[in-house]
Amino acid sequence: MSVDSMLCDRIDIAKQLIKRSEALSRSRVGGVEGGAKLCSKLKAELKFLQKVEAGKVAIKESHLRSTNLTHLQAVIESAESLEEVVSVLHVFSYNDQFGEKQSLVVDVVANGGHTWVKAIGRKAEALHNIWLGRGQYGDKSVIEQAEDYLLASSQQLVQYSSPHIIFAFYNSVSKPMAEKLKEIGISVRGDIVAVNTSQENLPEENYLSGSESDCDGDDTAVLHVSKVDTENIVASIAFPTEIKVEACKRVNLDITTLITYVSALSHGGCHWLFKEKVLTEQAAQERQEKVLPLLKSFMEAKELFACESAIKDFQSILETLGGPAEKERAALLVKSITVVPDQPSERASKLACSSKINSRSISIFGTGETLKAITMTANSGFVRAAANQGVKFSVFIHQPRALTESKESSATPLPNNYASSNLL
């Protein structure tokens, strides 16, 4: 292929990848984190190639082959192959074995955060040579990179488990490297190719000194040379269609969840116009999407916990604002919960209080972390504020529902023909 035709091909690929990256960003409600960064990198590549095409930049054919497009294409193809992609080109911080702060770019974070993918576009032969120490000075082998991934993932738990790591090879990987990756706990995706070992005779003075050589009196030493055979594919591994995640079986209930679970709004009492605007808004949200089935589905077959502070404050709120049916449902719910003392985790206790962070929330969410439970909550403000201080909790966030049974006497029933456009 001539340089001109290769250039045209690269420009076409860049344009297609930009479209695919934009579609990827739209594939998730709220967007895919890092999608804009990915798109920006692709547009920069396209701009550079168009400058080359216009004669503004001189470039060698070898440089044209080694643009970032290969890697960016691998990132997009990986993201398109997986479910629940939450981010691309995400930077994670971690401490290395010496305690030094390091950062790691994970190409694709999928499966709701449970899967990390490194997309690799380099050729198998180059990767194999670097691993054997034949690369350029400073080149880091894939195995060394895998060790970084393992260390970083052990410090970035998702629901108290380390993310599963996949290395996706788009230009093959040698069998010995694939086996080594699997040995240390990395899943491999892509074509696995054979390595042929040949023997070359070298003059002994070019290889080993006489005292070091196993050759007895020979003038030559045998050098075993391995070479990747890209034509000999010994296995081809696709992305798993379904990655099984060991689900956390413990749930910690926040006050907002306790209230939502027993609220009259969640039990059919959403066909009212309340005097309080916030209650009317919540009633409209409930008519649009029922919250109780979501809560029950998540809580099913799990152990339910709540700390003493949460139960005490819930019962206090219930006594003041709850209606008879809401109190009855609350009594049944509390019976199914294991109530534990407040025992906030060390990192939760270090959170600085603010308008969104108070001592009660620290106790509730921190106790959930100590229990290694997922905290169910409608308090997304606290979750965001804590994350801004570097503390990310394992949470299930849902819409809030207030106690409304006692408010129904002063509310206006919705007429049967009430239009959805007049919900509020």
UniProtKB/Swiss-Prot annotation:
It comes from the Eukaryota. InterPro entries: DUF1308 (IPR010733), DUF5614 (IPR041076). Belongs to the UPF0415 family. This is UPF0415 protein C7orf25 homolog.
